[in-house]
A protein has these predicted regions:
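Functionally critical loop-and-helix segments that line ligand-binding/catalytic clefts
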Residues: 1-14, 19-24, 141-220
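Substrate-binding cleft of extracellular glycoside hydrolase catalytic domains
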Residues: 2-121
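Ordered hydrophobic segments in well-structured contexts
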Residues: 7-9, 29-33, 56-58, 90, ...
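Polar/charged alpha-helical tracts
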Residues: 16-20, 24, 79, 138, ...
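Conserved beta-strand termini and adjacent loop/short-helix elements that scaffold enzyme active sites
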Residues: 60, 125-127, 180, 230, ...
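Short acidic/glycine-rich loop or secondary-structure boundary segments that cap or lie
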Residues: 67, 132-134, 248-253
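Catalytic domains of cell-wall/extracellular-matrix polysaccharide-remodeling enzymes
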Residues: 87-165
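Short, surface-exposed polybasic-aromatic patches that bind anionic ligands, especially phosphate groups
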Residues: 216-282
Length: 282
């Protein structure tokens, strides 16, 4: 998406066929709710994806500050995505925060890390006051710059654009999208404006194959890897290899999560670890 593009976000409250909403809102771009906690699935999600141009999917979080619950919710989300590929997966964090800001932040980052390790671009959605009260958002944006989608409404009048209400923009660093209304059309519909161009150029392609940069072209075409790698000494920690990128893993719990979803854990000599790691871009 480009700056000043619009998109709508929808859930099971909308119909399976999004054509009427697209025609009335003026955009076919959507972000679709797929799951909530580990108990709710939007049964319309696939149909909604099929009748629109989805740019992302979202999960409504209930994990608060519980990192283990965050992990289970991330896996549940990933296991129930519609078949249409997207770049963005969104964490909707607007209820059930604990009183421990650091616990909330750590759980959020754990969820986003799992999303990133699957090759998607994680996005954090919420409201500014709720975020500032419950989350150390600087930690989130330090790891995932420009990853914020913030909702803030001037009123509940029908507003197809944010013209005339920019004074209500939730001034924060790293805001990629602004959800400026929940009433883009009569009868309620969330609509957002894009503030930053997408920072990728390729067709959406979530993690399915991971190619080794050191292999030949023919080998790259046939080889698939899903690995968490550590050195024999353990001094270098763990890394995951995702879409030709190496991603440091700070939490051993992330390794356990990746193993649950099919990643192989390998251990190599320290020198080999360094050589392999250098073969991948960050």
């Amino acid at each position: 998406m480009k700056k000043n593009d619009y998109f709508i976000d929808v859930s099971g409250w909308q119909s399976p066929d999004l054509t009427p909403y697209i025609e009335e809102s003026g955009t076919d771009k959507t972000i679709i709710k797929v799951t909530e906690s580990t108990y709710f699935l939007n049964n319309y999600a696939q149909s909604q994806a099929d009748t629109s141009n989805p740019v992302g999917y979202y999960h409504f979080a209930r994990f608060g500050g519980n990192i283990n619950q965050a992990e289970m919710e991330a896996i549940y989300f990933l296991n129930n995505l519609p078949s249409k590929n997207v770049h963005y997966l969104v964490l909707d964090y607007e209820e059930d925060a604990s009183s421990d800001v650091q616990a909330n932040t750590s759980a959020i980052l754990h969820f986003m890390d799992i999303i990133a390790l699957h090759g998607y671009q994680p996005i954090y959605y919420s409201y500014k006051p709720y975020t500032l009260q419950n989350v150390d958002i600087a930690q989130v944006t330090a790891k995932y710059p420009n990853s914020l989608w913030i909702g803030a409404y001037a009123d509940y009048a029908v507003r197809p654009t944010p013209d005339g209400i920019w004074d209500f923009f939730p001034t924060m660093d790293h805001v990629r999208w602004w959800q400026f209304t929940s009433t883009a059309i009569m009868g309620c519909l969330d609509k957002s404006i894009v503030l930053l161009d997408d920072d990728f150029d390729t067709t959406p392609q979530p993690l399915s194959t991971i190619t080794n940069e050191t292999t030949s072209k023919d080998e790259k075409e046939n080889e698939t890897m899903k690995i968490c790698m550590r050195s024999h000494s353990g001094k270098q920690g763990y890394i995951a290899i995702v879409d030709g990128r190496k991603i440091p893993i700070a939490d051993i719990g992330t390794v356990a999560t990746l193993k649950k979803i099919g990643f192989d854990e390998i251990s190599v000599h320290d020198k080999d670890f360094d050589n392999i790691a250098q073969a991948y871009s960050k």
